[in-house]
């Protein structure tokens, strides 16, 4: 799901039409405040937000979006007419994953959105693999605990079978018990 945030209805409609044509489910918001409410209710996979908006700017919205507690990562693209490299860096420092400078042609827009989609797919795969690794580690810890318990019982049994634990010999004592090194 993609959230398009822009105070210009025309810009929202242009972006929405392109995204829907490429197969994305799109939701729109006309302000940063409205977008933040929508994100709290149902976090989007990808956000495309105008930088310059009245009220909560795209930059401020990006920071607040990153502060939300979310189960999965949301890819954030800031849209701006600012082409100064320091401004672009400011957007990235605020938490944006990409900054697109207007005017944006459909091929460039599609390429950036698809790059974001690839990032999200990789992130989901990594999350699933981390979950599997964590579950496997938990099982291994349980198995390790059971093996330790069995070794302790085996040690007790071994000790119960010995009549004498040490034998005094000339020059020292000989232990009749084997002890594990670990």
Task: Walk through the language-model features, giving the residues of each.
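Short amphipathic alpha-helix used as the core "switch/output" element in two-component signaling
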Residues: 37, 59-70
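… and, occasionally, acidic/histidine-rich disordered N-termini of signaling adaptors
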Residues: 135-182
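The feature encodes the CheY-like receiver
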Residues: 12, 53-55, 80, 84, ...
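Active-site residues of response regulator receiver
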Residues: 6, 50, 80
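Charged docking surfaces used in two-component/phosphorelay signaling
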Residues: 13-21
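Active-site beta3 strand of CheY-like receiver
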Residues: 42-48
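Alpha4 helix (beta4-alpha4-beta5 surface) of REC/receiver domains from two-component response regulators
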Residues: 60, 72-73, 83-98
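Acidic catalytic/metal-coordinating carboxylates
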Residues: 10, 30-34, 57-61
């Amino acid at each position: 799901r993609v959230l398009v945030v822009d105070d210009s209805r025309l810009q929202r409609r242009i972006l929405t039409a392109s995204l829907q044509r490429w197969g994305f489910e799109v939701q729109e918001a006309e302000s940063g405040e409205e977008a933040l409410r929508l994100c709290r209710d149902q976090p989007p996979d990808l956000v495309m937000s105008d930088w310059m908006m009245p009220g909560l700017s795209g930059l401020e919205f990006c920071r607040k979006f990153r502060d939300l507690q979310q189960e999965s990562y949301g890819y954030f693209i800031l849209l701006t007419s600012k082409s100064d490299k320091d401004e672009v860096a400011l957007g990235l420092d605020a938490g944006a994953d990409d900054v697109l400078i207007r005017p944006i042609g459909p091929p460039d827009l599609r390429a950036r959105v698809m790059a974001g989609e690839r990032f999200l797919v990789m992130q989901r795969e990594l999350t699933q693999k981390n979950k599997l690794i964590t579950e496997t580690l938990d099982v291994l810890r349980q198995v390790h605990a059971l093996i330790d318990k069995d070794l302790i019982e085996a040690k007790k049994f071994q000790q119960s079978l010995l009549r004498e634990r040490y034998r005094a010999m000339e020059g020292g004592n000989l232990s009749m018990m084997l002890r594990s090194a670990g």
